[in-house]
From Swiss-Prot:
Its main location: cytoplasm. It comes from the Bacteria. This is Co-chaperonin GroES. HAMAP family: CH10. PANTHER family: 10 KDA HEAT SHOCK PROTEIN, CO-CHAPERONIN GROES. Disulfide bonds: none annotated. Keywords: Chaperone, Cytoplasm. Together with the chaperonin GroEL, plays an essential role in assisting protein folding. The GroEL-GroES system forms a nano-cage that allows encapsulation of the non-native substrate proteins and provides a physical environment optimized to promote and accelerate protein folding. GroES binds to the apical surface of the GroEL ring, thereby capping the opening of the GroEL channel. Heptamer of 7 subunits arranged in a ring. Interacts with the chaperonin GroEL. The gene is groES. The keyword Chaperone applies. It comes from Streptococcus pneumoniae (strain ATCC 700669 / Spain 23F-1).
Length: 94
């Protein structure tokens, strides 16, 4: 299993038509974003004082991420992307 460092996240991209809360996103919105599930999170980042700031998302969250963000990786037969937390646009709450 992949364990990201810092504020990075491992995401499993959903390969189906994108919806947010049951609403299908318009074609142009689908081209700019993708829906993914958070598979793993890094510990977060440290402030200048040394305090740890944990990620805003947790494993299992569904998120909306920028379409071209991240690095494509494989772990066995599974495909994932690794992104920085700044590339997450929203958490999808259902």
């Amino acid at each position: 299993m992949l364990k990201p460092l810092g504020d990075r996240l491992v995401l499993k991209v959903e390969e189906k038509e994108q919806t947010v809360g049951g609403f299908v996103l318009a074609g142009s919105a689908q081209e700019k974003t993708k829906t993914a599930q958070v598979v793993a999170t890094g510990q977060g980042v440290r402030t200048l004082n040394g305090d740890l700031v944990a990620p805003s998302v947790k494993t299992g969250d569904r998120v909306l991420v920028e379409a071209h963000a991240g690095l494509d990786v494989k772990d066995g037969d599974e495909k994932y992307i690794i992104v920085g937390e700044a590339n997450i646009l929203a958490i999808i709450e259902e």
